[in-house]
Amino acid sequence: MNISATSQSVPEVAIFAEHLVRRFGEFTAVNDVSFEVKKGEIFGFLGPNGSGKTTVIKMLTGLLPLTGGAAQVEGLDVRTHAEEVRERIGYMSQKFSLYDDLTVSENLTFYGRIYSLPADRLKRRISEIVELNGLGPYLDRLAAKLSGGWKQRLALGCAMLHEPKLLFLDEPTAGIDPVARRQLWDLLFELSGHGITFFVTTHYMDEAERCSHVAYIYYGKLIADGTPNSLRELRDVQPPGTLRVEITTPEVTRALRFARQNPGIRSATIFGQSIHALIDDHFDLHDLREQLLKEGIAVAEIRPLAPSLEDVFVELTYKHQALLEASRA
């Protein structure tokens, strides 16, 4: 992918990233990362804590210089047009960064003035955002008195005041309850329907399932990039000659120990009251049940299972952990 050439001919692409590298002294935080984000997409950027997600966002928004590689955001080179990039995008940080001692209305007005919005446009935008984000009942409430979910709605509203077509959201639902998370995602889908592009970092797999495109970064390296459906079909996730099954049991710890010692089971992970296991497809499920029962492990059900995104990322993580350990040996 050649950014300078391609970006001129593919106007529907909001972000190009090519061979991004970021080093801090001897430590490489981002190592040869390339991807693209199409306009109107909700692009999920996943990875464990410390994997480089926030560093990539800071590089793409011009807040952190690139050590190597190149990137364009909304058609602008982040190396040479960082200020213009920041004028065209919205950014919502991982932590609530608005003013606790200002009301909802005062926060919106303050950030609108930071964006130098004319008074008439600011009034219009505040009215639109209050209606869209449901902030009307809270206009006179101090930000400090809002629940986590409403704080995030306010932060999103402030990031949208200048009508950006691209929004970077760094773990926007961290620390808020499941209902508020779902409501915030419903709002993102509504905004996406109006042509707004979202670059969202998250470590919630149910949120990743809702993205139109997903990339997974692990210790600075991009190890998966595609639609949720295409990632489920990766050979690394379910190689030929294997079957993924769910073993439902009240004794998940013992069942996991059994699975990891069984030569016919390639991998196994606990998911609630069940085990997700990748087995050789010649392994008869009735025989598997009998082996578990012989070990004194009660089994409620064993059934074939389509891989979830969580299965995908667990398998990819195991593989790359093994590669890292082998390279250090």
Across the structure, where does each feature detected by a protein language model lie?
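Conserved ABC ATPase signature
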Residues: L142-L146
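Conserved catalytic motifs of ABC-family nucleotide-binding domains
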Residues: E163
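ABC transporter nucleotide-binding domain
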Residues: D186-I279
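Conserved ABC ATPase "signature" region
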Residues: T109, R113, D120-Y138
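Catalytic Walker B motif of ABC-type/P-loop ATPase nucleotide-binding domains
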Residues: L167-D170
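Conserved ABC transporter NBD signature motif
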Residues: G69-D77, V85
